[in-house]
Amino acid sequence: LRKTLLELGFKCIEEIYIKERSKFYPVMVLIKGEDELSKVELTYGKVALINNDEVLKEYLLKKKDELEKVFNKIASSRVKGDLELIDRGLDYYGIK
């Protein structure tokens, strides 16, 4: 969304996040203009980040927790699979 708005010649001058029914939404005030945004600013909103928006912080912490759980499950299953493969290899040596 922010990338498209920039391409259309708009820049955000005010931004807050709101939470409704466990969903997060950015609310922006735009004016005609140009701005340069880093990848993180483009993703989450430069103004909201600079202003330390509390709802955005809650969103980021929630997403981090969700992704870490997914990552740990993937990593665990990958490690488990690797260990099983190693055990099968050690079976050739009579090692349990």
Predicted regions: what is each one?
Residues 1-96:
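Class I S-adenosyl-L-methionine
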